């Protein structure tokens, strides 16, 4: 059973982004096929304190050694065991602080300000940075958050074939009438935030739908999204097809637009979404690295103000209810711009 499912497509509202942030040089590398490489050694992106030597390379789950996989799962469990600090409603652990943060951003005075808005991708990039920072600072984690290469599994026809769904990792599908996950490192994990805006005790739920997940996450769907050359239509497509599709068809907790970070797989999924954005940005960095547009409030849940919708710009402030200091969209647009310092492997 799906919970509060991810919403309909957002409007294609575009605006010119401010240009006061540093832009990359144009000497990026291309392969013979014309596609930008996924290696993160391309000159021109690094700025501020980020250098090639300092940069973290995020890897696909299957590229981690068994020790690295265990270290990551141990760090996630550490957050689940640590007491909450945020003071947000219904929090019981540091991990639940992050779930409550995500839900809180869907319940502002302007309703949901992190989905169906221009800042959808920048805010979630910031959110991944918060998660990674807390894992390191509070659980002594020295690695990175891995991602799940969803298109690889969708194209193979076996959406749930990755070892990440194994009994020694995140566990697999839910079972029984409640779709509770009963294997893996987080078997029988109890959530207290959600479903939706409720605060109840319930199990970690999944309800896989392989056919629909494959249709939304395969290379045909991704190719369609990548046919868009500007941020708003590309972001809309990614948000509503591979992003929303995988959330919905993992089902259970992941299909709850408000409280989906209660499933640790959420962060693997959003690392992949972030990787898709970064690869798209690098295809044409002169035009895409700082390309931002779209409304800052969810038009489906608000009445248009007399002055029209405010569009996202590089100066728009991203907030986390003081879990980490606020930053701006401009600071997170370039993963190697100094505020952030990471790349992705070349799978």
Explain the meaning of each model-derived region:
Residues 19-347:
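Intrinsically disordered, flexible peripheral segments
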Residues 1-31:
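Fungal secretory targeting signals
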